[in-house]
C-alpha cells in the first residue's frame, strides 16, 4: 500500500515480473554485485517498498547477507546502529539523508567506527529526500580520511508503483541532487506541467494498477501508458542528457507570487540549505 501521505492509501498491485525486472535492472547498473555477494546492514522494514523490493531482494538475488539493524536514525536508537556498524562492515549502505546526518558525528570522532564502516564499502546510497551538499561533502571527507579515497555516492528515484527504481546514479557525479538516468528497461518522459517538467514512467517495473480501484488506475496513466508519478525533474545539463536528471520537487508544490513569478520550492529549499551550511540543516518554504 502507498503511504497515503497526500490521500487515502492505495493497494499497489506488485507482480513477480516487476520484482524480477527491478533486480535485473539494478544488477546491470552495479555489475559488481555478481562478482561478490553483498553484505548489508539495514533498518528498513520489509513492509516498505525500498526495504523489501530493493534491499531484501538485492541480497536474495545475489546470494548476499542481510543483517537486521535494530537501530534507526532517531534519538535513542541511532546508538544501536553505531554499535552494529562496529561489528558489521557493509559493502553497500542505504539510508535517508537524516540517517547520514545523525551517523556522521560518530564517524567523524570515532576512528575505529569509521574504519569498520568504510573498510569494504563499495557504495553509499541515499534516497527518500534530497541530500544537502554539506552532508555529501562530510561523507566524502570522512571516506578520504579513513581509506585515502572517495566511496561511490549514488542515489535513485522511484515509487511504490514502480517497484522501486526508475532512475539510477551508477556513474560518477560531483554533487548531490542528481537522481540519475533511466534504469535499464525503463522509459522516462518529461512532460510540461505549469512551470515544471513532470516525470512520467513506463516499463516492466511499473504496476498494472491499483487493487480493486479501476477508477484510480485509469487516472494514474496517460494515453501512451506512462505512469503519472507526480514528481518533477529537469536535466542537469540540457546539452548533455547523459549527465542525468535533477529532482525538482512535486509538480503541485510550487506557488505563484502576486507579481506572477513562480516560486520553485524544492530549488529554493536546497539553495538555502547549501548557502547557510552548516548552520542551517533544513528549511521550509511557505507562501
What are these regions (language model features)?
Residues 230-232, 236, 275-287:
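C-terminal boundary motif of the adenylate-forming
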Residues 173-182, 221-225:
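Short Gly/Pro-enriched turn/cap motifs at secondary-structure boundaries
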Residues 62-64, 82, 91-94, 104-178, ...:
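Gly/Ser/Thr-rich phosphate-binding loop
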Residues 1-24:
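Conserved AMP-binding A3 loop
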Residues 4-5, 63, 128, 158, ...:
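Conserved G/P- and acidic residue-centered "switch" motifs that form tight phosphate/ATP-binding loops
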Residues 197-257:
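Conserved ATP-binding/catalytic segment of the ANL
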Residues 20-39, 46-115:
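Conserved AMP-binding/adenylation subdomain of ANL enzymes
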Amino acid at each position: 500500500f502507498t503511504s497515503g501521505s497526500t490521500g487515502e492509501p492505495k493497494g499497489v498491485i506488485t507482480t513477480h515480473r516487476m520484482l524480477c525486472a527491478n533486480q535485473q535492472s539494478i544488477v546491470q547498473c552495479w555489475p559488481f554485485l555478481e562478482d561478490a555477494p553483498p553484505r548489508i546492514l539495514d533498518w528498513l522494514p520489509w513492509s516498505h517498498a525500498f526495504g523489501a523490493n530493493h534491499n531484501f531482494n538485492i541480497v536474495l538475488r545475489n546470494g548476499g547477507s542481510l543483517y537486521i539493524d535494530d537501530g534507526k536514525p532517531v534519538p535513542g536508537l541511532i546508538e544501536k546502529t553505531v554499535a552494529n556498524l562496529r561489528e558489521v562492515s557493509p559493502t553497500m549502505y542505504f539510508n535517508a539523508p537524516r540517517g547520514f546526518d545523525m551517523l556522521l558525528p560518530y564517524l567523524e570522532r570515532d576512528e575505529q567506527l569509521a574504519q569498520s564502516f568504510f573498510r569494504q564499502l563499495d557504495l553509499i546510497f541515499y534516497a527518500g529526500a534530497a541530500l544537502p551538499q554539506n552532508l555529501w561533502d562530510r561523507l566524502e571527507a570522512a571516506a578520504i580520511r579513513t581509506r585515502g579515497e572517495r566511496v561511490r555516492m549514488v542515489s535513485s528515484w522511484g515509487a511504490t508503483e514502480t517497484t522501486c527504481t526508475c532512475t539510477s546514479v551508477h556513474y560518477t557525479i560531483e554533487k548531490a541532487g542528481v537522481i540519475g538516468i533511466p534504469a535499464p528497461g525503463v522509459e522516462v518522459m518529461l512532460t510540461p506541467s505549469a512551470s515544471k517538467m513532470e516525470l512520467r514512467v513506463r516499463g516492466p517495473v511499473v504496476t498494472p494498477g491499483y487493487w480493486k480501484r479501476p477508477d484510480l488506475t485509469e487516472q494514474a496513466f496517460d494515453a501512451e501508458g506512462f505512469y503519472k508519478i507526480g514528481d518533477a525533474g529537469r536535466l542537469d545539463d540540457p546539452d548533455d542528457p547523459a549527465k542525468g536528471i535533477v529532482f525538482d520537487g512535486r509538480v503541485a508544490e510550487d506557488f505563484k507570487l502576486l507579481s506572477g513569478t513562480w516560486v520553485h520550492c524544492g530549488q529554493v529549499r536546497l539553495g538555502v540549505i547549501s548557502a547557510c551550511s552548516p548552520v542551517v540543516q533544513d528549511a521550509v518554504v511557505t507562501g
